């Protein structure tokens, strides 16, 4: 996960829409190297026409007494008069003596966009004598993205209020005349307040939804040829393509390319997703034999794959999804030092996979389960002395599930815990459960990709996202798996340490991201390694 933070100067004058002057942008808590007017995408839930804020008693809502939670307080519960996915259900906590709203809790579900549901907590305070307004807002959201369903938290804090200041107009004029980024908060949501050629500013009709970045990526993987590769790349993303709520993400780096798209309610009530990727760098896959990584029987592999998925929210955080994937594997001779003379390569070709998945996400708790079935090309591979056949004519199955928890221990300090199990049937060396590499069934940091071939994997992970300051954001995870090897049916333990860090941008770059894994323990000799990437990004 990650977070995007902003610091604004907020200008509000009676009878006018509020204006915000962007002072700072933080990627994962680290200050980004941005100057001038740089507009990042705005992702918000659909706005409601009428909000039950501060006891406005809007006619679209029905109100009822919720009793006294503590002496001197009263709960006022509200719900929409008629069904409306954009309307809120919730409660206001009111001070009985003054009639002031102290706290507001509200939520919406089944929203028709990227944000599928949200739960908000608004805290009110007296910012000046007789002036009562929100001072803090926390929002918990469920998004449908190109990578699936994810949980997002927003936190807004208002402080250092200056009311009826003598220099308000001068400060506002200075903000408008500056070259910095500004926004206006309109009834339809936040819109960029763009500087024009004559020095004036204009409200953009639509919310900014797209962005681009140039990337310099260094890949580290001992299975690649070469094991360290520096790649230039271009990133493009849009959260409202064609104005229809379509999400698009794409990365092209020459030898590695990936793209994905998601269309909320793209087919009736079903969310549609699609993705494609291709790796043109050859990896050399070496088998595990008798509990250690072999220096023989190495096979080179390149691949490309596409996938299509359908999903539907069932309410209360439950969701069901189905997808189909097509992957083309091109096998060739591996690195020279790992080749075995006379080794027959496995059959290249198309592998088809269908998967059904159910999930539940609620207030940081996560549960997932899946069942998949597929077919790969038939054939044989190996040496004359030890020939191997693709089992069951290429038909195979896989299944598994996991439980997880994300919890903010204190502001900015996040805990993640996860445990799960994955299994299957009719696997072989070139179609099995892997625990290394980004595309593996279970990813354990610091384990070589496509080295361990297993038919059962049980795993557990724990991690902390540590707010170390504006110049560093550090996430550390400890990961362990117990795998049953196809080679001999024995179970082996593997452990790795993941380290993800964000650093402030420098020179021409906006931000720096480091994601590396180090293998710290393995019952299988030779499969631990240093792997991951370092990315330098320039947003424009």
Language-model regions: role of each:
Residues 28-61, 73, 195-218, 341-490, ...:
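C-terminal outer-membrane beta-barrel translocator/porin domains of Gram-negative envelope proteins
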Residues 147-275, 280-286, 313-321, 349-362, ...:
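Outer-membrane beta-barrel initiation region
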Residues 8-10, 120-129, 263:
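Extended lipid/amphipathic-ligand handling interfaces
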Residues 142-152, 272-313, 328-341, 512-534:
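Outer-membrane beta-barrel translocator/channel fold
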Residues 70-77, 100-105, 131-138, 212-213, ...:
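Short, hydrophobic/aromatic-rich segments at coil-to-beta transitions
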Residues 64-72, 94-100, 123-133, 467-469:
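A short, structured loop/turn motif at beta-sheet edges
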Residues 1-89, 97-100, 110-118, 142-197:
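Structured extracytoplasmic
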Residues 104-107, 137-138, 217-219, 249-253, ...:
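Transmembrane beta-strands of outer-membrane beta-barrel proteins
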């Amino acid at each position: 996960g990650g977070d995007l933070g902003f610091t604004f100067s907020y200008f509000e004058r009676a009878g006018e829409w509020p204006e915000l002057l962007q002072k700072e942008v933080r990627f994962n808590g680290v200050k980004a190297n941005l100057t001038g007017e740089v507009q990042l995408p705005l992702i918000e839930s659909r706005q409601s026409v009428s909000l039950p804020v501060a006891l406005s008693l809007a006619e679209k809502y029905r109100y009822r007494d919720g009793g006294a939670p503590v002496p001197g307080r009263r709960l006022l519960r509200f719900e929409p008069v008629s069904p409306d996915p954009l309307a809120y259900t919730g409660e206001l906590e009111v001070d009985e003596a003054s009639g002031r709203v102290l706290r507001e809790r509200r939520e919406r579900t089944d929203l028709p966009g990227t944000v599928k549901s949200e739960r908000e907590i608004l805290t009110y305070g007296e910012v000046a004598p007789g002036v009562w307004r929100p001072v803090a807002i926390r929002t918990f959201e469920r998004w449908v993205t190109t990578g699936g369903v994810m949980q997002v938290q927003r936190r807004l804090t208002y402080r250092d209020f200056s009311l009826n200041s003598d220099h308000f107009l001068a400060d506002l004029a200075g903000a408008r005349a500056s070259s910095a980024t500004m926004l206006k908060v309109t009834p339809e949501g936040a819109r960029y307040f763009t500087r024009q050629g004559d020095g004036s500013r204009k409200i953009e009709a639509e919310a900014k939804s797209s962005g681009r970045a140039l990337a310099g990526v260094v890949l580290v993987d001992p299975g690649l040829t070469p094991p360290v590769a520096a790649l230039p790349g271009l990133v493009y993303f849009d959260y409202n393509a064609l104005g229809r709520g379509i999400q698009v993400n794409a990365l092209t780096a020459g030898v590695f390319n990936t793209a994905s798209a998601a269309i909320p309610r793209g087919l009736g009530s079903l969310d549609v997703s699609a993705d494609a990727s291709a790796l043109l760098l050859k990896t050399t896959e070496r088998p595990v034999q008798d509990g250690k990584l072999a220096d023989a029987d190495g096979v080179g592999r390149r691949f490309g794959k596409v996938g299509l998925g359908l999903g539907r929210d069932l309410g209360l955080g439950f969701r069901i999804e189905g997808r189909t994937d097509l992957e083309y594997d091109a096998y060739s001779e591996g690195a020279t030092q790992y080749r075995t003379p006379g080794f027959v390569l496995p059959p290249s070709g198309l592998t088809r996979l269908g998967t059904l998945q159910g999930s539940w996400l609620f207030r940081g708790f996560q549960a997932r389960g899946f069942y998949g079935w597929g077919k790969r090309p038939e054939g044989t591979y190996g040496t004359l002395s030890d020939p191997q056949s693709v089992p069951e004519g290429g038909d195979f199955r896989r299944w598994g599930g996991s439980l997880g928890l994300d919890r903010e221990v204190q502001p900015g300090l996040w805990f993640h815990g996860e445990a799960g199990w994955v299994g299957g049937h009719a696997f072989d060396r070139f179609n099995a459960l892997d625990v290394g590499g980004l595309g593996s069934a279970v990813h354990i940091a610091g384990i070589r990709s496509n080295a361990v071939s297993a038919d059962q994997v049980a795993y557990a992970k724990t991690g902390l996202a540590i707010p170390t300051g504006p110049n560093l954001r550090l996430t550390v995870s400890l990961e362990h798996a117990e795998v049953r090897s196809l080679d001999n049916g024995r179970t082996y333990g593997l452990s790795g340490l993941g380290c993800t860090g964000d650093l402030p941008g420098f020179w021409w770059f906006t931000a720096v991201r480091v994601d590396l894994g180090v293998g710290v323990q393995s019952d299988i000799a030779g499969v631990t390694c240093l792997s991951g990437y370092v990315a330098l990004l320039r947003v424009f």
